[in-house]
């Protein structure tokens, strides 16, 4: 059994760590609320943009945009949104597993994949597994902007336009609630018509000044809005996961302190009992 002094040192060290994890939990909770607000602000725009392009994909276009036209899949691209920092539980690991499963389905068909990484953790992981990373972005901060994402997104859009990839997906975490974040892999390009409910109320558009000019701009805005919303939502997921992870660490530290305190009391009791035994034994000898 460890000595009382050693146990006291361990208890002191764990208490210091507990203070840190407790502070990180509170900071993450505050950041999560702000990230949730940003996520909710952008959702209506992203959702409406998705509806509009869904209608367009289902309509009879006078101009068939490249992003709407289906073609034979020879190469697939992924935009993977991860975090720059760790200490957020299994958030990144679960996402990476989902992406690997999805990409393996294409690999089994003999189709190669390219990756655009957003977040340092994703870049490090996919480099370690030998993935072909064509673009990467890190240190986007807690308040990302569309302008900071344009460069990486443009790499994938140019690749699609040049025929280097024939299908593009965005991969991120979906914020269900504070306790639950689920990985998702969504198809970005080519656009596919929305579900039957939208088909029933779909319509054709009149384009001014002309369909090509309007759709060329609209499609790029659509991709940017979907990727940006994925980044913002992933940020909320990160803070929620970190808050839960730090709460779990704080609780575990408390349990460990209680166990060590009990061990310390037992060690102290044993030491006192031994001293009394020695005193009694010495007195009896006299």
From Swiss-Prot:
Keywords: ATP synthesis, Cell inner membrane, Cell membrane, CF(1), Hydrogen ion transport, Ion transport, Membrane, Transport
Gene3D superfamilies: 3.40.1380.10, ATP synthase, gamma subunit, helix hairpin domain (1.10.287.80)
Top-rank lineage group of the source organism: Bacteria
GO molecular function term, any single one: proton-transporting ATP synthase activity, rotational mechanism
A Pfam short name: ATP-synt
InterPro entries assigned to the protein according to its UniProt record, in alphabetical order: ATP_synth_F1_ATPase_gsu, ATP_synth_F1_gsu, ATP_synth_F1_gsu_CS
GO biological process: proton motive force-driven plasma membrane ATP synthesis
Coiled coil: none
SUPFAM superfamilies cross-referenced by the UniProt entry: ATP synthase (F1-ATPase), gamma subunit
GO terms under cellular component: plasma membrane; proton-transporting ATP synthase complex
UniProt keyword Lipoprotein, yes or no: no
Protein topology in the membrane: Peripheral membrane protein
UniProt-annotated location(s): Cell inner membrane
The keyword Transcription regulation belongs to this UniProt entry's keyword annotation: no
Function according to Swiss-Prot or TrEMBL: Produces ATP from ADP in the presence of a proton gradient across the membrane. The gamma chain is believed to be important in regulating ATPase activity and the flow of protons through the CF(0) complex.
PANTHER family registered for this protein in UniProt: ATP SYNTHASE GAMMA CHAIN (PTHR11693), ATP SYNTHASE SUBUNIT GAMMA, MITOCHONDRIAL (PTHR11693:SF22)
Family: Belongs to the ATPase gamma chain family.
Subunit structure comment from the entry: F-type ATPases have 2 components, CF(1) - the catalytic core - and CF(0) - the membrane proton channel. CF(1) has five subunits: alpha(3), beta(3), gamma(1), delta(1), epsilon(1). CF(0) has three main subunits: a, b and c.
Protein name, per record: ATP synthase gamma chain
Taxonomic classification: Bacteria, Pseudomonadati, Pseudomonadota, Gammaproteobacteria, Cellvibrionales
